[in-house]
Amino acid sequence: MTGVPVPFGNPGAEAQVWVDAHAARLAPLLREAHLAEWESAVTGSEQASAGLAQTRAAVKRLFSDPEGARRVRDLLDSDEIEDPLLRRQLQLLHLEFTANQLPPETIRELAELSAALEHTFHTFRATLDGAAVTDNALLEILRDGDDVARRRAAWEASKQIGRHVAEPLRELVRRRNAAARSLGFADFYRMELELQELDEERLFALLDEFKRATDTPFAALRERMDRALAGRFDTAPEELRPWHWSDPFGQEAPPEGAVDLDALFAGGDLVQLAADFFRALGLPMDEVLARSDLWERPGKGQHAFCTDIDREGDVRVLCNLRPTDRWMATLLHELGHAAYDVHRPGDLPFLLRTPAHTLSTEAVAMLMGRLTRDPRWLREAMGAELTREAQADVGEQLRTSMLVSTRWMLVMAHFERALYRGPDREDLNQLWWELVEEMQRIRRPEGRDEPDWAAKIHLSSAPVYYHNYLLGELMTSQLGAAIRRSGAEGWEGMGHFLRDRVFARGAQEDWAGLLVHATGEPLSARFFVEQFVAG
C-alpha cells in the first residue's frame, strides 16, 4: 500500500494509516460479496451463484497477502500500539489473515464448492406425489396433517436434498480440512473455533454441562409430549417416529397447549406487526423492510437470513412469510439481527462496525424471536386478551420450545465436530441418528440409512456456526435478566438498553468482554436454567 502519507516516527499513527488503507480496500469487496450473496438467494440463478464464488474469493485473496499478515502480526507483538480500538482492529485483521494464507487456486476452489452447494439449496424443491413442493408446503403437512402415511412421505421428501448434497459437502469438508492443516491446524472445525475466539475444550465442557442440566427435565417433557402425540395419532409412544413431529428435524416443538398461536397470526399482517413493534422499541426497521424480500416465489432461497451489505445502513432480510407463529418469530428474529446492524454508531471504524460476535447478534435475534410466546407482547403488540390460565399456557409453550430447540442444537454441534474430524467415516448416517436419539429422544426409522444430516443447510452454507445458537440462547436469558435488573421501562426501555449497552460497542471488544459490559457477568448457563429448567 504505497502512496499513503505516514506520520514519521509515530508507530501508532503509522499502524492506523495502514489499517485504514486496508479497510478502504476491503469495504467495496465486502459490499460486492454481500450483494452477490443476496442476488444468489433471491434469484437462484447460476450466474448469480458464479458471481458469489468470485466475489467471496476476492475478499479472501485480499487477506491471503503474506506481507500484510506479517505486518499485522509484528504490530500486535510490539508494545507500541496503546490505543485499544486500534489494537482490536489489528486483532480482527490477524484472525482474517490467519485463515486465508492460502494459494489463490485453493481460495477459488473453496469458494466455488461452497457457492455451488448454496445454489443447490436455493433452487432445490422436494418432490411429493410427483410434484415439486416448497418447504412451507411440507411444514404445513407436518404441522396439520393427520394422515400418518402422508406425514411420513412429507418428512422423507424434506430429506431428499441430503442425497444431492452429501458427497459435495463431504468433498468441501475434505478441502477445508486440507486448507486448515496447511495453516497448522488439526482440522477446519478447530481452526474456525480459534478464529471465532472460542476455546474448543471450554465450549464442549459448557455444552456437556448444559446437557446434564437439562437431561432430567427434558426427559420428563418428552414423556408428556410423547403421550400427547401418541393420543393424537392413536398409537403407542414407542411407535412414534420423526414424521409425527411438526418439524423435519424435531428442532421445534409440536403445537400443543390451550392457546393456538398460529390462530392468533392467521390473517394478520406480519410485516406491519413487526414494523410497529420495532418502532415501539425505538429501533425503527421501516427502511430495512422496504429493502427486504419477504415472500415466496420459485427459485428463491427458502432459508431466512439477514445481511448487512455495506456497514453503512444497507441491511436486508430474506423470508418466505406465511401468517403463522413460526414465521412471525422468524421475522422478529431476523429483524433483531437487522436492528443490531442498523443501530450501531456510524462513527465506529469500519472494521469495528459489526456485532462483537456471531453469538452476540444471535442473542439479540433470539430475544426478539421469543416474543411470540411472551404474554405481554401478545397483549400489547397483537391485542390478544389472554386469561391468567392462557398466559401460563403460553409461558409453558415458551419453556417447551426452548428445551426442544436447545437439545437439537446439541445434535448439530456434536455432529459437525465429528464430521470435520472424519468426513470419510462410513457411519456418519448412523452417528447422526445416535445423536438424535441421545439428545432429542426421537427414534430413528427402522432400516433407514440416508444422509439425513446433509439436508440441514447450515452444514453447507454456515460452517462451524450452530454452537453459536446455543450460546446465543444462554446470552439471551442473561441479557433479559440484565434488562429487568436495569429498571428499563416498557419496550422503549428495552430498546435503549440494547442500543446503549450492546449495539453501541460494535466489535470494540470480544464477545466475552461485551457480555460483561452489558450484564456485569461472564457467560453462564445459570440464567437460562433459572428461566426454563429450575422452575
Regions found by a protein language model. Name each.
Residues L207-P217, P355-E389:
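Post-HExxH zinc-binding segment in Zn-dependent metallohydrolases
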Residues L52-R56, S64-A69, L193, E197, ...:
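Extended, well-ordered alpha-helical scaffold/bundle regions in very large, multi-domain proteins
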Residues D293-Q302, L352-E362:
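Beta-rich nucleic-acid/ligand-interaction surfaces
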Residues P323-V342, E362-M366:
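Active-site recognition of the HExxH zinc-binding catalytic motif
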Residues D129-A137, D144, R170-L318, R388, ...:
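Active-site-proximal, well-structured secondary-structure segments within enzyme catalytic domains
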Residues A154-I161, L193, E200, F204, ...:
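Glycine- and acidic
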Residues G3-A15, E46-Q47, Q91-L92, D187-R190, ...:
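C-terminal, non-catalytic "cap/extension" segments appended to globular domains
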Residues M1-E167, Y189:
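N-terminal helix-rich structural modules
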